[in-house]
Regions:
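N-terminal functional module of multi-domain proteins
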Residues: 2-120
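Short active-site oxyanion
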Residues: 104-109, 124-129, 160
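A conserved active-site-flanking secondary-structure segment within enzyme catalytic domains
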Residues: 126-153
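Conserved anion/nucleotide-ligand pocket segment
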Residues: 152-153, 157-193
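Basic, amphipathic alpha-helical hairpins
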Residues: 179-183, 220-236, 255, 259, ...
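Accessory alpha-helical/coil subdomains and C-terminal extensions
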Residues: 181-225, 233
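Basic/polar phosphate-binding segments, predominantly the helix-turn-helix DNA-binding elements
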Residues: 226-228, 234, 238-273
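Hydrophobic positions on the alpha-helical face of helix-turn-helix-like DNA-binding modules
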Residues: 240, 286-288
Length: 288
């Protein structure tokens, strides 16, 4: 069972929290109906001050203080309800050390919409790709210049860090997480229940092939991103690596060390999994 820590920050957006809870509750319900052990333990995370004030608001969920010894497998940061993000971040500074501590302990972190501002405030997104609500992307980029902001992305996944854009992008990221923790079949079923358009993904997330982004080799990461972005037009791996500051042999060795496979096989897997995603999407549409 995976421990989910859903932060309820100051100025949180209720619809964002409701969507997160609804999806993960539905996953657990599906497992319960099939007499299977529940895969997810949903925990509400708040400050001691908030717990005293909102003691009955999240009835039915364990409410855990940031001062407890709780350890999450994944921390979830919902969207904010206000446009005054500077003031909101000031209110939520208390959460930053807790998020950092959870990450150091091995947790994954996922933010939804403008929740990316709190995530980025921890410094954990520095040097990583991230997205947020399109209307807030310029402010986000200027506030956190070390973050590689991708405003056109619905979802980003970089190592143990995940972000989503605004509105229905929340569901796109939730589906990714369901797939990661519960598998393709459950993820596709959840997508059908919530009428989520899988075709909005910019990468093949529904995959038995799971690329490794947790390494620290920038050159390998650069090749991975090039393959995933331009896999249709790539004819040979030599065309990708010709301008890189290392020999072909060295690059292939490093790439295989970090990803487990050589670049050409990585390219083939990306193409296969993209085709798989398109087929799964076609099947969902035909069953509607």
């Amino acid at each position: 069972m995976k421990n989910l820590g859903l932060i309820i920050p100051f100025d949180y957006k209720l619809l964002s929290v409701a969507a997160i809870l609804d999806v993960f509750d539905t996953v657990n319900r599906i497992y319960a109906e099939n007499h299977r052990e529940l895969p997810l333990a949903i925990n509400i995370i708040q400050t001691p001050e908030q717990i005293k004030k909102d003691s009955n608001f999240f009835h039915g969920y364990p409410v855990t203080s940031i001062t407890s010894d709780f350890v999450a497998d994944i921390v979830l940061i919902p969207s904010f309800t206000t446009s005054n993000l500077k003031e909101t971040l000031s209110k939520n500074q208390i959460y930053i050390p807790w998020i950092q501590e959870q990450f150091r302990a091995g947790a994954e972190i996922a933010s939804f919409c403008t929740g990316a501002f709190l995530f980025a405030s921890t410094g954990l997104l520095n040097g990583k790709t991230a997205t947020t609500h399109v209307d807030a992307s310029h402010t986000f980029a200027s506030s956190f210049p070390l973050v590689l902001v991708k405003p056109d992305q619905t979802v980003t996944a970089d190592g143990r860090c995940y972000t989503s854009g605004g509105s229905t992008s929340t569901f796109q990221l939730l589906i990714l997480l369901v797939q990661k923790y519960c598998g393709n079949d459950i993820a596709i079923r959840i997508a059908k229940i919530f009428a989520i358009d899988l075709d909005r993904y910019t990468q093949s997330y529904f995959s038995t092939f799971r690329p490794n982004y947790t390494h620290n080799d920038d050159l390998v990461m650069r090749i991975q991103r090039e393959i995933e972005t331009n896999y249709v037009d790539i004819n040979t791996i030599d065309g990708i690596i010709k301008d890189l500051p290392a020999s072909r042999r060295n690059i292939v060795r490093r790439f295989k060390k970090e990803t487990g496979i050589p670049p050409i096989e990585y390219l083939q897997n990306i193409r296969i999994e993209t085709a798989r995603r398109q087929l799964e999407q076609t099947n969902i549409v035909s069953q509607k």
